[in-house]
């Protein structure tokens, strides 16, 4: 079984860091509950490019980005026992080295690291299982035979579960569900 594991919003709390950087740069505090859509930068009156630049600034401070779960290393190791785990991540190219440092710092082991350019869909990379928070990826995969574990986040709450799109709140839950397959 080949497993594609996302970073932002699944392993790393990029949203928390974006909130912090935005507050530092503008003096305006936003709450995580405001992030109810994938393109939430519109609510901040930002362009896509301005938001991508903010992501680069956030990841340049990678040591400050918190993991979303306290036992990530163990969870990814458990995933590796049920399949081959690859990191499949879509991001500005300038953040790749920062992300790799973050993964190493948190002792997250994986077989390969695949960067997906911003204009490309992760769905073009064929895996048996995807663990991701993207509502766009869920939309692309909904009529396929590929399984997606949609990591629960405020920006994907409007995605309906389907037979192959399963909502999860933790990587532990993914491991449990995969063990039953």
Regions found by a protein language model. Name each.
Residues 1-51:
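Active-site neighborhood of HAD-like aspartate-dependent phosphohydrolases
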Residues 121-124, 173-181:
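Short amphipathic alpha-helix with an adjacent loop that forms part of the alpha/beta core around
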């Amino acid at each position: 079984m080949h497993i594609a594991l996302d970073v932002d919003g699944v392993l790393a709390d990029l949203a928390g860091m974006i909130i912090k950087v935005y507050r530092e740069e503008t003096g305006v505090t936003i709450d995580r509950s405001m992030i109810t859509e994938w393109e939430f930068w519109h609510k901040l009156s930002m362009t896509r490019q301005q938001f991508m630049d903010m992501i680069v600034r956030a990841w340049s401070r990678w040591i400050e980005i918190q993991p979303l779960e306290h036992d990530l290393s163990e969870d990814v190791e458990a995933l590796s026992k049920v399949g081959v785990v690859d990191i499949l991540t879509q991001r500005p190219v300038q953040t790749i080295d920062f992300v790799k440092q973050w993964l190493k710092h948190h002792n997250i082991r994986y077989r390969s690291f695949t960067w997906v350019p911003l204009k490309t869909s992760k769905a073009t990379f064929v895996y048996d299982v995807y663990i991701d928070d993207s509502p766009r990826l869920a939309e692309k995969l909904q009529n396929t035979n590929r399984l997606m574990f949609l990591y629960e986040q405020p920006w994907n709450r409007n995605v309906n579960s389907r037979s192959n799109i399963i909502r999860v709140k933790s990587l532990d839950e993914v491991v449990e569900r995969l063990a039953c397959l």
